[in-house]
Amino acid sequence: MKSSARSAQSAWLVEKIISGGQTGVDRAALDVALELGIPCEGWCPRGRRAEDGVIPERYPLQEAPTSNYADRTALNVRDSEATLILAKSPLRGGTALTQKFADRYRRPCLVVDPREAKSSAIVIAWLSANNARVLNIAGPRESLRLDVARDAANFLRRLLNRKLVTKKLEPKRVVHTTT
């Protein structure tokens, strides 16, 4: 039997998290991935620039060619299979730009409020429907909404701290008998 990450009996809900390292949702995504042992990476602005200063080295991020946040956002969307935005609508600033880049790169994009109870089920169904395993996670920075990182981290722990069973079903063998 040929094996691959996607046909394994049991695999993480996502195989890799991509995020940009900004305060808020980006860091929450990276923190939860590191905590759960899910591979993570992403692009950050040149100089590891974020609203609180330099992004700590513990985050496995590659510096983009420029210090422009928009360039970093485009690279993260491009390098993912889908983008999950954790935010309450309407989207603003860089979060809205993330959604525009998802449209440009023709990547599935879902916006959910991490404080809504039904959001986990919606995300699981969306990931399965899109067969998305490399997930860009984005949302507001901490200065735009207090506690956004905490809410995002709690949501992502509940969402990602489970296995997605991808058991390959064998076709049923039908035996006809005559009497």
Annotate each predicted stretch with a short phrase.
Residues 12-134, 141, 148-159:
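Acidic/glycine-enriched connector segments
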Residues 5-11, 170-171, 175:
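Low-complexity, intrinsically disordered tandem-repeat tracts enriched in small/polar residues
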Residues 144-179:
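Charged phosphate-binding loop/patch that engages nucleotide di/tri-phosphates or the phosphate backbone
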